[in-house]
């Protein structure tokens, strides 16, 4: 690794900008592909409950590969790991375009995403340090949410025009991400020379889980981010079901517009968190987490587009302010104890286990016929109570 790469820790360095561009294109593809594939399922007359199952196979890949992807991220240059992972996403999207079963293709994309995540967040701690890491996380989240905004809308709008065209656009986005990864500096592997025996890797991963869980700060971060992303992915699918019921709109584009409002809000909230919250004042984000659940419950009762847009914007702002400091806290503390790649892999296991549980409960509620509005209200109330309980628990732990 060159000396310039070692010393340039600016969040506007060439390496950081390359990471952000690659992340934008990869996240654009992820979000466009979700809505394009949902449109494909609708066009092929799959039942409503199968929609969250699509995300569950994606999440299942994260959980299955969780013991291995952190070590992969720490054993090789993270930029190259990101490139290979985006190549897997490209293969999955291209496969769906060519007619393979959408659940199979989406699973392949999930495997790529599982390998990609520890590398994309772990590399931030190698390109910058300290409180700049909070700002770098804010920049990463802003880039991601901008991609969610544009990707979700593009996926829905293109799918209303032509489903295959939407799928091709996703494949092209992944191809662009692969190209952008080539411009990321080749950093020295964080932890080379580890054992590649599956039993040793599994033991190492679960040892990292134990280390992070026993630390009060990282445990707090793991639970908070798990609850947030589990709720976030469930809200996405709830919107697809809620829009026709509450608003009487049946196209593919409207749920993507509503999801985009959440994305805009998260950009604002992430920026506010970068300015107002440090690693020493992370608990400032907790009231925002409680308010997310309250606003979701209020949102579920709406029957007009304008207040729905406004409330989803507010949900996004609260979400960005809540999750960015928790991510930065885990990366900083995890880098020092188990390595950034392993820390993010453990975080992914927690987040995706929460997603799988929440999506499973949501699918069950849809299958047994619970109305969409009732699901939304119950979901919001339970989320607010869960974050309040986490905050109380964290304060008690800190007082010991």
From Swiss-Prot:
Q: Which InterPro entries match?
A: LysoPLipid__transptr_LplT (IPR023727), MFS (IPR011701), MFS_trans_sf (IPR036259)
Q: Does the keyword Lyase apply?
A: no
Q: Name one GO cellular component term.
A: plasma membrane
Q: Name one GO molecular function term.
A: lysophospholipid:sodium symporter activity
Q: Which subcellular locations apply to this protein?
A: Cell inner membrane
Keywords, A to Z, come to:
Cell inner membrane, Cell membrane, Lipid transport, Membrane, Transmembrane, Transmembrane helix, Transport
Q: Does the keyword Transmembrane apply?
A: yes
Q: Which cysteines are joined by disulfide bonds?
A: none
Highest taxon of the source?
Bacteria
Membrane topology per record: Multi-pass membrane protein
CDD domains per UniProt: MFS_MefA_like
Transmembrane intervals? 19-39, 53-73, 91-111, 139-159, 164-184, 195-213, 227-247, 257-277, 281-301, 304-324, 352-372, 373-393
Q: What does this protein do?
A: Catalyzes the facilitated diffusion of 2-acyl-glycero-3-phosphoethanolamine (2-acyl-GPE) into the cell.
The record's similarity note reads:
Belongs to the major facilitator superfamily. LplT (TC 2.A.1.42) family.
Q: What is this protein called?
A: Lysophospholipid transporter LplT
Q: Which gene encodes it?
A: lplT
């Amino acid at each position: 690794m060159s000396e310039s790469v070692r010393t340039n820790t600016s969040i506007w360095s060439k390496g950081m900008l390359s990471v952000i561009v690659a992340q934008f294109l990869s996240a654009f593809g992820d979000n466009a592909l979700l809505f394009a594939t949902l449109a494909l399922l609708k066009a092929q007359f799959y039942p409503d409950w199968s929609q969250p199952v699509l995300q569950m196979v994606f999440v299942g890949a994260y959980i299955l590969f969780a013991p291995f992807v952190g070590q992969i991220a720490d054993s090789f240059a993270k930029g190259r790991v990101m490139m290979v992972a985006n190549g897997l996403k490209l293969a999955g999207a291209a496969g769906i375009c060519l007619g393979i079963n959408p659940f199979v293709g989406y699973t392949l994309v999930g495997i790529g995403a599982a390998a990609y995540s520890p590398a994309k967040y772990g590399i931030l701690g190698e390109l910058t340090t300290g409180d700049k890491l909070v700002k770098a996380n804010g920049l990463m989240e802003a880039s991601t949410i901008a991609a969610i905004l544009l990707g979700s809308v593009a996926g829905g709008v293109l799918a209303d025009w032509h489903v295959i065209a939407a799928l091709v656009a996703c494949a092209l986005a992944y191809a662009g991400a692969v190209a952008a990864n080539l411009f990321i500096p080749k950093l020295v592997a964080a932890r080379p020379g580890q054992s590649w025996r599956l039993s040793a890797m599994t033991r190492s991963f679960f040892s990292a889980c134990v280390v992070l869980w026993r630390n009060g700060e990282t445990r707090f971060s793991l639970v908070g981010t798990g609850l947030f992303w589990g709720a976030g992915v469930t809200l996405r699918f709830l919107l697809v079901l809620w829009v026709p019921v509450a608003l009487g709109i049946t196209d593919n584009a409207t749920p993507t517009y509503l999801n985009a409002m959440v994305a805009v809000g998260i950009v604002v909230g992430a920026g506010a968190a970068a300015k107002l919250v440090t690693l020493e004042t992370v608990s400032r984000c907790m009231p925002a987490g409680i308010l997310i659940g309250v606003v979701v419950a209020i949102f579920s009762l709406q029957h007009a587009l304008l207040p729905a847009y406004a409330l989803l914007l507010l949900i996004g702002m609260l979400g960005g302010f809540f999750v960015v400091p928790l991510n930065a806290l885990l990366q900083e503390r995890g880098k020092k104890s188990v390595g950034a790649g392993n820390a993010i892999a453990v975080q992914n296991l927690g987040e995706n286990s929460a997603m799988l549980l929440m999506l499973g409960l949501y699918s069950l509620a849809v299958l047994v016929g619970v109305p969409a509005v009732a699901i939304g209200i119950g979901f919001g109330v339970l989320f607010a109570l869960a974050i309040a309980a986490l905050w109380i628990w964290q304060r008690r732990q800190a007082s010991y």
